[in-house]
Design a protein with these regions (language model features):
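Structured C-terminal helix/loop/strand segments within mature extracytoplasmic catalytic/sensor domains
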Residues: 12-109
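A small/polar active-site loop signature that marks catalytic segments
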Residues: 1-10
Length: 109
């Protein structure tokens, strides 16, 4: 699976209808809100607060170096870089997302 495909899969958490690209409704607004809140507060293990502060989006990291981040009602972005930091999150992935949300002024805060 490519990271383009991964970001497309997670778009249901970013679009305002909480549905697939084919229009199949997956979640209620309440469910999507809860999932995004959990991702914002828990998606990066012990570094979740730092990710929220630096990037400002709900997200989830994987030990393979992947990160998925969601801007509700706007977009979903996936990045990958295998070098992990001390908290087992992608070092360059987090750095890229921080720069991206700063330059585009697209943090949720």
């Amino acid at each position: 699976m490519s990271y383009k495909e991964l970001s497309e899969i997670f778009m249901f958490l970013a679009n305002d209808e909480f549905s697939t690209s084919k229009g199949n409704k997956i979640l209620s607004m309440s469910q999507a809100k809860r999932i995004n809140a959990i991702m914002l507060t828990c998606g990066f293990y012990d570094e979740s607060g730092e990710f929220a502060f630096r990037v400002g989006l709900p997200g989830k990291s994987g030990v393979g170096g992947g990160i998925i981040a969601i801007h509700p009602d706007k977009y979903c972005i996936a990045v990958w870089s295998p070098k992990l930091n001390e908290q087992s999150n992608s070092y360059k992935g987090m750095l890229f997302l921080e720069k991206f949300t700063t330059r585009t002024a697209s943090s949720i805060f």
